Structure formats: structure tokens, C-alpha cells
From Swiss-Prot:
Superkingdom of origin: Bacteria
Similarity comment: Belongs to the AdoMet synthase family.
UniProt-recorded name of the protein: S-adenosylmethionine synthase
Binding site for K(+): E43
Broad enzyme group: transferase
Known EC number: 2.5.1.6
One GO cellular component term noted in the UniProt record for this chain: cytoplasm
Subunit structure: Homotetramer; dimer of dimers.
Binding site for ATP: H15, D164, A165, K166, R231, F232, D240, R246, K247, A263, K267
The species this protein was found in: Shewanella piezotolerans (strain WP3 / JCM 13877)
CDD domains: S-AdoMet_synt
Cofactor details (free text): Binds 2 divalent ions per subunit. Binds 1 potassium ion per subunit.
GO biological process terms held by the UniProt record: one-carbon metabolic process; S-adenosylmethionine biosynthetic process
Sequence positions that bind L-methionine: E56, Q99, D240, K271
């Protein structure tokens, strides 16, 4: 008998908020490619026929904001005016200014290792052992569904798909925390006007849902909701405006872990909202990979202009194999969580961010914060 249900959602790269995230991170990458020490805070707003890019930047680099924006929108798939949003004809407004010298004064140091945090704040990292990437299953499979939607749209397996899509997966859990199965699946996808509802439902079920969701978790009682409104022709920035940083739960753990509130996209690594959240994931994943806990949530916090974290705390939900006080001591000894230290530890001062801006920042092994290279040393130091 399942004790409880838990749901997470994801959105595709063509969702308006994700278009904005990807443009912000594409601008960030272009700047970091020329100037790894740049300070970037890039925000994007998209609506019918227009994109506005704003924020604060301090850099020696020059990048073509208009060309970066058009290229990003084109790669996502908005390439026809009949979609209401066309990479080649949309208006692009550039409202980028310089970063405040007051912030620079707090961050920059004569000794780079003493670089202060770019702002105050609290960040969380999380890992558990219910998937092979040590992520919660609901968000992992929600991402997989919309990623699959993008793949079969772009390779024209389902040529009537359009870029905007959303997924949601509800898992049932047993009393011991193990997965009992999938209770419900929601997949809403934008489509051409000429496809029938019957063809759409069959195509989505056979080409997207069944290849992605493990059969062992599906049953006759699993509920499927495919385009439950019956029509999703108007989508993307025509249907809704999009803004950088509005999908922070999709970007992280799907609600299974707490969130400090800071968004990621468009921010260089001096912004601990982003870099410390990545480092916290790295710490939590290595603790779980080392077998020191089955679930681990770590919180770190910072004061603007101060290098050392103001706090580190760990919650293992009763699954720790050693005392949580020892875990905190291990974290302090094995991980440098100062802004400069974590940037060096994870090699963050380089153009790797646009790829993070759709389908989740965590649980994807191509990113350096997903490595488990500290697990063996942690386990040995813990005496296990």
C-alpha cells in the first residue's frame, strides 16, 4: 500500500520562460568565452514578436546581443511567423548596463582566493539514491518527457509538434520511501492546427511516453492526461510572456528539496545564487554516492563581500550512516565553499551555461558538479 504521492513538473526549451533562460545563458557564455572574469547578470523578457535583454555587465568583451538572441531562438525552433514568434523578424531591445561599483568593491580582492560573495543568500543542494543520477525520480522523468518531445519534434518523427510543451509526473511511494509506481502522467504539447486529437494522443503515448517511462512503474491504474484541454495551437511567447528565472523548481529538484529562492540563468559564477547551488549539489551527491546517507540536503549561506560561508547545515532525513556533525566536518575538510574556491573546484569560469538552461541543471552527468570524484575519499575519511 503506497503511503503518499509526490509530483514534479518540467517544461520544454520552447516554453516562454525557458526561451528567456536560454537567451540569458547564451549571452553569458558568449561573454565568458572572451572574458572568464566577467561579471554578468543578464535578464530576458519575451512576448509576441519581441525580446528585451537587460541587466548589468562588467567585461572587456564585446558580443552581438542581437545575433546571439536570434541564433538561440532559431535553435529552439521558432522560425515561422505563423507561430507568432520568428527568430529572423522579432524585435530585439538591448537594455544592458554596467554593474554597480559598490558590488565590485565587495566582491573583488587583491588576493583572488579571498573573493567575496556577490550577494547574501542561502542555497540548497540535494541528492538521493532513487535514480542512477542520484536525483528524485519525479523531476528526472518529467525532464526526460519534454526532452523526448523536443527530439521527436526536431527529427520530424512527429512533424506536427511545436516547441512549447509541459510535463508532470506523479510517483507513488511506499512507507519505506521506495518507489511503488507512477500514479499519473501529464503531457501537454503545442501542435499544428491540422493534427487530430486522436493522432496526437496516439503519437505522444507511443513515441514520447512509452519509450521514456520504465514499464515496471506503469500499471493499468496509471492515469494519462495528454493535452487535456483538447487544443494547444497557440503557445510560446504568443500564449504567455516569458521571463528569466521563473522556473526555479523545474531547474532544481522538482520541489523535493528546499530552495533558497535565487535563480540561475544569466549569472556568472561570482553570483553564489548559482555557483554555490551547484557546489551544494556536488557535495550532496558525493555524500550519497559515498554511501554516507541515502538522502542528503545541504544548506549553505553567504554574506555579501565575505568569502567564508556564514553557515553550513545538513539534513539526511534519518538516512545517515554517520553522525550529521561528522558530515559537516567532512564537508568543511573536503570542499572549498568560498566563491573563488568553488569556482576553481568545479571549473565554472567558462562558457558551459546555455546547456543548463533547459531540462534541468542537475542529474546530467556532462556537468562538473555531477561528478562523484570525492565519494571514495569521503567514505574513507568517515571510517566506512
Amino acid at each position: 500500500m503506497a503511503k503518499h504521492l509526490f509530483t514534479s513538473e518540467s517544461v520544454s526549451e520552447g516554453h516562454p520562460d525557458k526561451i528567456a533562460d536560454q537567451i540569458s545563458d547564451a549571452v553569458l557564455d558568449a561573454i565568458l568565452e572572451q572574458d572568464p572574469k566577467a561579471r554578468v547578470a543578464c535578464e530576458t523578457y519575451v512576448k509576441t514578436g519581441m525580446v528585451m535583454v537587460g541587466g548589468e555587465v562588467t567585461t572587456s568583451a564585446w558580443v552581438d546581443i542581437e545575433e546571439i538572441t536570434r541564433k538561440t531562438v532559431r535553435e529552439i525552433g521558432y522560425t515561422h511567423s505563423d507561430m507568432g514568434f520568428d527568430a529572423d523578424s522579432c524585435a530585439i531591445l538591448n537594455a544592458i548596463g554596467k554593474q554597480s561599483p559598490d558590488i565590485n568593491q565587495g566582491v573583488d580582492r587583491a588576493d583572488p582566493k579571498e573573493q567575496g560573495a556577490g550577494d547574501q543568500g542561502l542555497m540548497f543542494g540535494y541528492a538521493n539514491n532513487e535514480t542512477d543520477v542520484l536525483m528524485p525520480a519525479p523531476i528526472t522523468y518529467s525532464h526526460k518527457l519534454v526532452k523526448r518531445q523536443s527530439e521527436v519534434r526536431k527529427d520530424k518523427t512527429l512533424p506536427w509538434l511545436r516547441p512549447d510543451a509541459k510535463s508532470q509526473v506523479t510517483f507513488a511511494y511506499n512507507n519505506d520511501g521506495s518507489i511503488a509506481g507512477i500514479d499519473a502522467v501529464v503531457l501537454s504539447t503545442q501542435h499544428r492546427e491540422d493534427v487530430s486529437q486522436a493522432d496526437l494522443i496516439e503519437g505522444v503515448m507511443e513515441t514520447i511516453i512509452k519509450p521514456v517511462l520504465p514499464a515496471k512503474w506503469l500499471s493499468k491504474d496509471t492515469k494519462y492526461f495528454i493535452n487535456p484541454t483538447g487544443r494547444f495551437v497557440i503557445g510560446g511567447p504568443v500564449g504567455d510572456c516569458g521571463l528569466t528565472g521563473r522556473k526555479i523548481i523545474v531547474d532544481t529538484y522538482g520541489g523535493m528539496a528546499r530552495h533558497g529562492g535565487g535563480a540561475f540563468s544569466g549569472k556568472d559564477p561570482s553570483k553564489v545564487d548559482r555557483s554555490a547551488a551547484y557546489a551544494a549539489r556536488y557535495v550532496a551527491k558525493n555524500i550519497v554516492a559515498a554511501g554516507l546517507a541515502d538522502r542528503c540536503e545541504i544548506q549553505v549561506s553567504y554574506a555579501i563581500g565575505v568569502a567564508e560561508p556564514t553557515s553550513i547545515s545538513i539534513e539526511t532525513f534519518g538516512t545517515a550512516k554517520v553522525a550529521e556533525e561528522l558530515l559537516i566536518d567532512l564537508v568543511r575538510r573536503h570542499f572549498d565553499l568560498r566563491p573563488y574556491g568553488l569556482t576553481e573546484m568545479l571549473n565554472l569560469a567558462r562558457p558551459i551555461y546555455q546547456a543548463t538552461a533547459a531540462y534541468g541543471h542537475f542529474g546530467r552527468n556532462e556537468f562538473p558538479w555531477e561528478a562523484t570524484d570525492k565519494a571514495e575519499a569521503l567514505r574513507a575519511d568517515a571510517g566506512l
